[in-house]
């Protein structure tokens, strides 16, 4: 199977600063591929190189069978892009935004007339077709941005932080719409800071930091290999003495702020020891992708 996207030994520098460092990526048709990393990891620069908007210092890139940046305009005709921030035209209605974008891709009036009603239905905006963009909620604008990115029936949909700033209801509706695209065979490249989003949608992940790949695999494989046990979060006062006492019951422990994390393969003894402890609260849960991300990239704030 021919990959829709390939990067081989791609490097990008700004001055003497290495932003992307010999990065390899490969996205197969039908995948939802998650590109994860903290702020400053190189995700945005990677996307810009893939689209031919900035040139790598070295390495090779292929997008939809086209070499990048040499044939980036041709490749972009087969790609849909959902940017991190909406760039809809506020002077036009919902339906006009879709029609105008269709013309950018050279679609005929007949093609636009056929596709627009289906995209309005996909975005659940049929009743708001004539509404002005400025009158839409944030969730509606985001759904319209996704629908607009599909106007050219792209081989690859690139989504940069697709649900940032949305409330939980709007976020779940976007997830449901994206799952319907994946069920229909679409290919998605996704960046996100919501680990739940990546765990729900992606069937393959790559974690980068400081421009380098530090982990890759399926979400459940990364959770098993990097964490491999349950997590008990403990909140309260005087956690250090509790840590000293209960550490033998855990594979490892970690203190961050006012939370003590126990990583345990057999949680029952630890839970029994915590039961009835005054001044503490605790939560026992399975390990998740956020645990993996924080283990790999650290818990320090990134600007």
Swiss-Prot record:
Leading EC class: translocase
Compartments where found: Cell inner membrane
Record's keyword terms, sorted: ATP-binding, Cell inner membrane, Cell membrane, Membrane, Nodulation, Nucleotide-binding, Translocase, Transport
Predominant location: membrane
Organism: Cupriavidus metallidurans (strain ATCC 43123 / DSM 2839 / NBRC 102507 / CH34) (Ralstonia metallidurans)
Superkingdom of origin: Bacteria
Gene name per UniProt: nodI
Protein's UniProt keywords contain ATP-binding: yes
CDD domains assigned to the protein according to its UniProt record, in alphabetical order: ABC_subfamily_A
Disulphide bridges: none
EC number of the protein: 7.6.2.-
Subunit description: The complex is composed of two ATP-binding proteins (NodI) and two transmembrane proteins (NodJ).
Biological role stated in the UniProt entry: Part of the ABC transporter complex NodIJ involved in the export of the nodulation factors (Nod factors), the bacterial signal molecules that induce symbiosis and subsequent nodulation induction. Nod factors are LCO (lipo-chitin oligosaccharide), a modified beta-1,4-linked N-acetylglucosamine oligosaccharide. This subunit is responsible for energy coupling to the transport system.
Name the UniProt record assigns to this protein: Nod factor export ATP-binding protein I
A GO MF label: ATP binding
Lipid bilayer topology: Peripheral membrane protein
InterPro entries in UniProt: AAA+_ATPase, ABC_transporter-like_ATP-bd, ABC_transporter-like_CS, ABC_transporter_ATP-binding, ABC_transptNodI, P-loop_NTPase
Keyword tRNA processing: no
Record-listed ATP binding positions: 37-44
Residue ranges annotated for the ABC transporter domain, each copy included: 5-235
Gene Ontology CC terms: plasma membrane
Family: Belongs to the ABC transporter superfamily. Lipooligosaccharide exporter (TC 3.A.1.102) family.
UniProt-listed Gene3D superfamilies: P-loop containing nucleotide triphosphate hydrolases (3.40.50.300)
């Amino acid at each position: 199977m021919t990959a829709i996207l390939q990067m081989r030994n791609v490097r990008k520098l700004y001055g003497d600063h290495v932003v992307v460092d010999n990065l390899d990526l490969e996205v197969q048709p039908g995948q939802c591929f998650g590109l994860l990393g903290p702020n400053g990891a190189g995700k945005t620069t990677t996307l810009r190189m893939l689209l031919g908007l900035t040139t790598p210092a070295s390495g090779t890139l292929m997008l939809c069978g086209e070499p990048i940046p040499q044939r980036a305009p041709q490749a972009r005709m087969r790609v849909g892009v959902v940017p991190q921030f909406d760039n809809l035209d506020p002077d036009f209605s919902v339906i006009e935004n879709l029609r105008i974008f269709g013309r950018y891709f050279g679609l005929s009036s007949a093609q636009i007339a056929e596709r627009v009603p289906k995209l309005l239905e996909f975005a659940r905006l049929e009743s708001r077709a004539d509404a002005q963009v400025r009158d839409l909620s944030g969730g509606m604008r985001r759904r319209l941005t996704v629908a607009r990115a599909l106007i050219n029936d792209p081989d690859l949909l690139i989504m940069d932080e697709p649900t940032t700033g949305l409330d939980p209801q709007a976020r779940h509706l976007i997830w449901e719409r994206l799952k319907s695209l994946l069920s229909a065979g679409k290919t998605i490249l996704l960046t996100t800071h919501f680990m739940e989003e990546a765990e729900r949608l992606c069937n393959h992940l790559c974690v980068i930091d400081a421009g380098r790949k530090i982990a890759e695999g399926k979400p459940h494989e990364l959770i098993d290999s990097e964490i491999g046990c349950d997590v008990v979060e403990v909140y309260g006062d005087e956690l250090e003495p509790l840590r000293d006492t209960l550490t033998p019951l855990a594979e490892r422990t970690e203190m961050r702020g006012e939370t003590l994390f126990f990583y345990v393969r057999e949680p029952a003894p630890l839970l029994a020891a915590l039961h009835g402890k005054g001044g503490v609260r605790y939560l026992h849960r399975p390990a998740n992708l956020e645990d993996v991300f924080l283990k790999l990239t650290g818990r320090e704030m990134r600007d």
